[in-house]
Amino acid sequence: MTKVITRFAPSPTGMLHVGNIRAALLNWLYAKKHNGQFILRFDDTDLERSKQEYKDAIEEDLKFLNINWDQTFNQLSRLSRYDAIKNLLLDKKRLYACYETPEELELKRKFQLSKGLPPIYDRASLNLTEEQAKKYIEQGRKPHYRFLVNHEPISWHDMIKGEVKYDGKALSDPIVIRADGSMTYMLCSVIDDIDYDITHIIRGEDHVSNTAIQMQMFEALNTTPPTFGHLSLIINKDEKISKRVGGFEIATLRKEIGIEAMAIASFFSLLGSSAQILPYKSMEKLANQFEISSFSKSPTIYQPEDLERLNHKLLISLDFDTVKERLKEIDAEYIDENFWLSVSPNLQKLRDVKDWWEICHQTPNVENLNLDKEYLKQAAELLPKGEITKDSWSIWTKEITNITGRKGKELFLPLRLALTARESGPEIASVLPLIDREEIIKRLTSA
């Protein structure tokens, strides 16, 4: 059996967002499940927009998610190889020189659209005589090159979409070499996939028409194409998510919002599939349950609040030995197991534990909360004597009810506000033993 080799090929022209991290996750998981290899390739032929800082940020995000690669390379290191294939395809008459300026091409496109026609290149340059081409060169025009798409049926079996069929006549010959000599994504990608023995490619369905053209490129290079799977697009409020329109960046999710790595990995590797989205604790366990056949063809709706709920579920499922290492990463190694177990059931983000440590160890500011001071002083007098335990809350509130007649929110909300300055959070029964008894009385009587 052929060894499974997948790849993820981001362009270092921006930060990773939830759309392309999904492709990275699924390619990694597919390779992992089949004991294969995963290759990281940087499509950096866009010289104007590609930046080292984006490459570094992409690698940082992947490492955070425990997406490790067996090999990595960038396309700029392979220009001589691409040039050799360019010459081969020119000899085979599958590449041809074009001399239109960007402005001329835009006019053609607008004219076609105004007539209700698809903006397919008219192959005007394919029919140029040598004299006409020479005249353009004398004018100082530099040629760009297009791949000649044969006007014949194209089909393949897609891992997600099933049978996909295209008519070559409906596809425009793509530009594969720009006028400045730089290569575009289309042909370089095929050459790389051939040279690195890529067997499976999972990517967004916005690449389906590209795949149809690339099928002919593989054929032109006498190679069997990889097996493709095209994921439905992730949408949020009826818009496709992409980095060019301000998609949700992974760096933002992990650094600013505080989502755990395995929450991100679990969520986006299961989103759009028939599998239940659960908070897996390791990439290995996630890979074991991964099934590419479970993914839907329909658009996938991403709701950030669903990810935050999953993050909460993950946090409360973690044992303290696991949490200890994460606490070091956020400079909170002073948190002990007892404190963690007391507050973790209500944490939304790991960093929230630092806030609750501060609340329990420093008197909060409640000056602007307009609390009922008489009630709080009365409650302080009724606080059970001796050591404060988890049972103290129920004993205390029963006594308060007996004396004041207060119940429910009228009883507990003023106490919560006076003790924590928060309307919500961990159960007060759990928080109470974390605060020194004298401090509890101080907070109640000075509110």
Swiss-Prot record:
<dbReference type="InterPro" id="IPR014729">
    <property type="entry name" value="Rossmann-like_a/b/a_fold"/>
</dbReference>
<dbReference type="InterPro" id="IPR049940">
    <property type="entry name" value="GluQ/Sye"/>
</dbReference>
<dbReference type="InterPro" id="IPR045462">
    <property type="entry name" value="aa-tRNA-synth_I_cd-bd"/>
</dbReference>
<keyword id="KW-0648">Protein biosynthesis</keyword>
<keyword id="KW-0030">Aminoacyl-tRNA synthetase</keyword>
<dbReference type="InterPro" id="IPR020058">
    <property type="entry name" value="Glu/Gln-tRNA-synth_Ib_cat-dom"/>
</dbReference>
<comment type="subunit">
    <text>Monomer.</text>
</comment>
<dbReference type="InterPro" id="IPR004527">
    <property type="entry name" value="Glu-tRNA-ligase_bac/mito"/>
</dbReference>
<keyword id="KW-0436">Ligase</keyword>
<dbReference type="GO" id="GO:0005524">
    <property type="term" value="F:ATP binding"/>
</dbReference>
<dbReference type="GO" id="GO:0000049">
    <property type="term" value="F:tRNA binding"/>
</dbReference>
<dbReference type="Pfam" id="PF00749">
    <property type="entry name" value="tRNA-synt_1c"/>
</dbReference>
<keyword id="KW-0067">ATP-binding</keyword>
<feature type="short sequence motif" description="'HIGH' region">
    <location>
        <begin position="10"/>
        <end position="20"/>
    </location>
</feature>
<keyword id="KW-0963">Cytoplasm</keyword>
<feature type="binding site">
    <location>
        <position position="243"/>
    </location>
    <ligand>
        <name>ATP</name>
    </ligand>
</feature>
<protein>
    <recommendedName>
        <fullName>Glutamate--tRNA ligase 1</fullName>
        <ecNumber>6.1.1.17</ecNumber>
    </recommendedName>
</protein>
<dbReference type="InterPro" id="IPR001412">
    <property type="entry name" value="aa-tRNA-synth_I_CS"/>
</dbReference>
<dbReference type="InterPro" id="IPR020751">
    <property type="entry name" value="aa-tRNA-synth_I_codon-bd_sub2"/>
</dbReference>
<dbReference type="InterPro" id="IPR033910">
    <property type="entry name" value="GluRS_core"/>
</dbReference>
<dbReference type="GO" id="GO:0008270">
    <property type="term" value="F:zinc ion binding"/>
</dbReference>
<dbReference type="Pfam" id="PF19269">
    <property type="entry name" value="Anticodon_2"/>
</dbReference>
<keyword id="KW-0547">Nucleotide-binding</keyword>
<dbReference type="GO" id="GO:0006424">
    <property type="term" value="P:glutamyl-tRNA aminoacylation"/>
</dbReference>
<dbReference type="InterPro" id="IPR000924">
    <property type="entry name" value="Glu/Gln-tRNA-synth"/>
</dbReference>
<dbReference type="InterPro" id="IPR008925">
    <property type="entry name" value="aa_tRNA-synth_I_cd-bd_sf"/>
</dbReference>
<dbReference type="GO" id="GO:0005737">
    <property type="term" value="C:cytoplasm"/>
</dbReference>
<comment type="similarity">
    <text>Belongs to the class-I aminoacyl-tRNA synthetase family. Glutamate--tRNA ligase type 1 subfamily.</text>
</comment>
<comment type="function">
    <text>Catalyzes the attachment of glutamate to tRNA(Glu) in a two-step reaction: glutamate is first activated by ATP to form Glu-AMP and then transferred to the acceptor end of tRNA(Glu).</text>
</comment>
<dbReference type="GO" id="GO:0004818">
    <property type="term" value="F:glutamate-tRNA ligase activity"/>
</dbReference>
<feature type="short sequence motif" description="'KMSKS' region">
    <location>
        <begin position="240"/>
        <end position="244"/>
    </location>
</feature>
